[in-house]
Amino acid sequence: MVLDGNSIINRAYYGVRPLTTRDGFFTHAIFGFLTMLGRLLDEEKPEALCVAFDRREPTFRHLEYEGYKATRHAMPEELAMQIPVLKDVLDAMNIPRYELAGFEADDLIGTISRKCESAGWDCVVATGDKDSLQLVTEHTTVKLISTRMGQTTTKDMTPESFREVYGFAPIHIVDLKALMGDASDNIPGVPGVGEKTAMALIQKYQSIDEIYRLLPDIEAKPNVIKKLTEGEESARQSFHLATIVTDAPLEFSPQDNLRKAPSDALYPLFMKLEFTKLIDKYGLKPPADIPAAEEPVDLTVTAEAVTTVEKAKEYLSLFRKAEHVTLLALPDLSGVIVDFVAGESTAVSAEFYFSRYEGDWNALLRALFSDDIKKVSHNVKDLQRTLLENDLPIEGFIFDTALAGYLLDATAGKYDIASLFAACFHQTLAEPKHLDPDAFSMLGDTAEAETAFHVYTSAVDALYEAFAPELEKRELHELYYEVELPLCAVLARMEHAGMRVDANALAAFGSEMEVQLKTLEQHIYEESGGPFNINSPKQLGEVLFERLQLPHGKKTKTGWSTNADVLEKLRWENPIVEEVLQYRQYAKFRSTYCDGLLKVIAPDGRIHTSFQMTVTATGRLSSTEPNLQNIPTRTQLGSEFRRMFVPADGCVLVDADYSQIELRLLAHIADDEAMKQAFLTGEDIHTVTAAQVFGVPTDQVTKQMRSHAKAVNFGIVYGISAFSLAQDIGVPVYEAKEYIETYFERFPGIRRYMDEVVAQAKERGYVETLMHRRRALPELAASNFNTRSFGERVARNMPIQGTAADVIKLAMVRVDERLHKENLKAKLILQVHDELIVECPEEEKEMVARLLTEEMEGAVHLSVPLTAEAHWGINWLEAK
């Protein structure tokens, strides 16, 4: 198999979202190329493999025709810089590559394919360039690679499949280009002859030689014959330019390209590029005989198993004296490894296992997790929840390496110990089959597992030593130590507390949904003329657009599109559409919320969600297993559903949320006087915006005007386009565009902020919140317009949304501290974006409501007031 190197890396560059290393080097084209290479190897399993590349020098085609490829744009710098590195990677993978001055990669591929055939080998050409189709024979298959909407597909072109598409033999693709030309290569063809005419001529006459032999007696319109006659010289030259050379002076033998194992040089290259997933995929290990670029981190320690109470007391005394200890625990708390420095610099590791300890295991754990031992760990929140579930203290944690890694790079995606260690130190950690490095689950009492457990604990300590000063350097220490780290304990307590659900009411609600679904189902069958599977998009599309002949149908490869956007446009065309939309809504509620939540109610009658701290790039918390943050609020069904969430007996729920926090932050960050004034005077911001945009006094603002202004306000924060705004509020695009332009005229500070934050992000390579949370934006350096536009939208939005996330987190820490300080029985149990829910005894409700508003409003001090409102009730709906 021979790969068209330039074609594939070019497609990877434009088809893969920009990726960079921590020092800013772009890697997405290389990563995309290697991903495609892996797929091709899995599909074809070739015995021999090589890659062909273009060279920078002019080829014989440039010398013969000055205009050859003259219209092509220069290669983007961020792509050009990756090609030499890709070649280094291929060399390290022991994959031969070919280049030849004066010839293109296509010519080398053509020559290689013919040499393979002569040697009795079949050849597969992998490329995204259709020029190579002329090489298709019984023994050479062209595997065409195409990328659409981020999805890569391949199609094998054989003589048979080619003829099915084109209607002539593969070799005559050159004749086709001789007539119609090739805009991408600036090959002229015959002026005035397009693809349709050229295709018809070649299908009938096969070649330009035959066409010109029969001129002027061919079957064609007189003007076509005239163009062919006048353009013969151009056709002949175009034929020559489009013909791939198959006898280039290239030394090649299939036997010299047999596949080999990667060399030791591949591991450090992948480490440098931060391709940790590919290191795992290829099973690479650090080369023993090649010195690392940096001094490797020594993870060896002097270890001792602690089995007696006396020895445990001795170690606990040492732990209390140490500046810090680094600790990892198994999920069931049956084993704990503690690393610490004894004396001057000696690293010591103490291992505690329940099965080997002769004393009171619970008392030992209580001592280990008390406040007088300062602990560094990984995924502290999860460990704290486990401790709470075992009625153990959760104090003394001074650092969480997972959280630190996330703050230092919020777009890395993986924050397990092995990934962070690889990215930080360019070393991989062994992952024995007996150890799950993400959860640290022992799958057997083995020496191998114990050794790995020690290694991972030492790795966490090394990460702590690397991350702590880096947080200080990037001005992230306050956010980390005052918000993120203390939030771990807050969330652990919230998860442990859970939220009570009225299971009987929820089951009854589900039964009611089932009745509604049956009723809707019968109505839909009556309207459509018979039963069908309403949940099948294919069958639904056939009913709506074929049987009922509704307008505006859009066909896809799998049938008619019946997504929400399509159905919304048809809502008034036929009653069946409204009923289908209702059916989908009820079905979603029943399966996701009724049936789904009933399954996860714990024996204590409560749902214990898990809050994820390292998932979103903006810093927002997310909720899983189950997700309690996505329960709909804008529909009657969603509102009714909140009735199912109730407090413990004798308690109420107190719900407090911020009022328009993102708009208030926008006013502060953008320093727009008009918007700030509206908040300072307590005016309704949407009414003020409507008055500004529509040019009317505030007392003349209609309900619709305010609604449109609200959409504009929140749309601006998220970088909405005129097209999207038009769809949201149901106006023409030009009208939506006028709204946005008028908005920026009336609030010039917002426009200035939007421009300045993008310019600053392009200069720095990142944006940040008021509390210095960063998000890297390699997308801003992309040459692809859509990718770059995405980066600009994120640059405008992230400082606002990210600061809102920081503020609510800080508010949670303050609320939790205050509840404990005032010895209240109230418990913070849920956070949903800008909303906090507390469960408290009836007699504490007023105090808790006041406490919530005070701590939320006092979390940060802005140039505009930050306001929060609190309400209480006997269920979540009433409290809201």
Predicted segments with their positions:
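Active-site palm subdomain of RNA-directed nucleic acid polymerases
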Residues: 471-483, 487, 807, 811-832, ...
